[in-house]
UniProtKB/Swiss-Prot annotation:
Belongs to the class-II aminoacyl-tRNA synthetase family. It comes from the Bacteria. This is Asparagine--tRNA ligase. PROSITE patterns: AA_TRNA_LIGASE_II. One of its GO terms (biological process) is asparaginyl-tRNA aminoacylation. It is found in: Cytoplasm. GO terms for molecular function: asparagine-tRNA ligase activity; ATP binding; catalytic activity, acting on a protein; nucleic acid binding; transferase activity. It is an enzyme of class 6 (ligase). The keyword Cell membrane does not apply. It catalyses: tRNA(Asn) + L-asparagine + ATP = L-asparaginyl-tRNA(Asn) + AMP + diphosphate + H(+).
Amino acid sequence: MENTLVKSLYRDTEKYADQTVQVSGWIRNLRDSKAFGFIELNDGSFFKSVQIVFDTELENFKEIAKLPLSSSVKVEGKVIATPGAKQPFEIKAEKIDIEGLSDSDYPLQKKRHTFEYLRTIAHLRPRTNAFSATFRVRSIAAFAIHQFFQERGFVHVHTPIITGSDTEGAGEMFRVTTQDLNNLPKGEDGKVDESKDFFGKETNLTVSGQLNAEAYALAFRDVYTFGPTFRAENSNTTRHAAEFWMVEPEIAFAELGDVMNLTEDMLKYAMKYVLEHAPEEMEFFNSFVDKTVLERMNNVINSDFGRITYTEAIKVLQESGADFKYPVEWGIDLQTEHERYLSEEIFKRPVFVTDYPKDIKAFYMRLNEDGKTVAATDLLVPGIGELIGGSQREERMDVLVDRIKELGMNEEDYWWYLELRKYGGTKHAGFGLGFERFLMYITGMANIRDVIPFPRTPGSSEF
């Protein structure tokens, strides 16, 4: 008999009513008495489990009744509609085969476990309701983002993981080497001789695919990357991880306003898609994790995003009368408390802050006519503050070279990036979305470690 997915049973219960089906899955819960028992069976295809009813008519009733949690079984039985019960149907088992036994020391017994504890068993935590919901939503949201760009004719570019350039100019990068760390070759100046290394120069794990994506935008017009990025930032916070995923579109013949429109369209599309394709999971998050999740998402979907310049935002914050921990003055990098005040108290919806001081932004952002600010934007959203950062890129060769020198960066490292301006350069723009930060926003999960399957953070690289 062909296996039927639990998802199919839930989505089309009438079709399967009174039919004999075969389902396979893992035991989430088991209750038994002398004459009959109940199994909550989850097959991974759906958030909810299916209830299996079995009785002494089974040849192996006693064996089944003693099965430990997480044992895997194959069940054949009739689908019985139960409109008055918690679940719309159950399966009356006619045959249960044991696929794999679980040891009695299985750590996920029927009790509440803290997220901190579940991080220590990251290989087992997707079997819990919270993480089953989280990682299915992660999958659905990733698909939605790909579909958004594909429907609009964007080319998906696979940018390199190993790179010789630092997009942010921040220097917080993981080094890649095959050298013997106990016997590093050194030059006459006593410094490590990078020419003897695998690539013949210093290389690192990428912090962003943006620079490479720009090269492809100047050939394909509209492109995007969606891949892992790495920061050797020793920040032990709920919002930082050493390995995370970034969505980075680049569009040619575009200015800052175009990329803000793209940002707004993509966010609304992805959120709508998740609400439509993961209703059970989103209801779970709204009930048990963060009771404002659905309201927050619908606020984003149904709002026209606000727009305000950095200079105007500073003035609004200074005149607000609010007691901020960090003083507000022109030139500061806005702190989370400032960002949340703007989005939650002033606009009460997502808002783009634009035209930041050049001294707090990256070298590649286009210098404005005032010479003090750049064509950059951060999208601030209620609940967390900054969600997305974007900018119009500097297309003028001389201005870009001046910025690189001004920041003390090595011009030679960016020779190919500068050449993009020599050969038919044009105005172009893009943004970066930290995918995990987006997931935290739509699920209410408060720690980035809980939206990545196997988190990599300072002092932790288990699994």
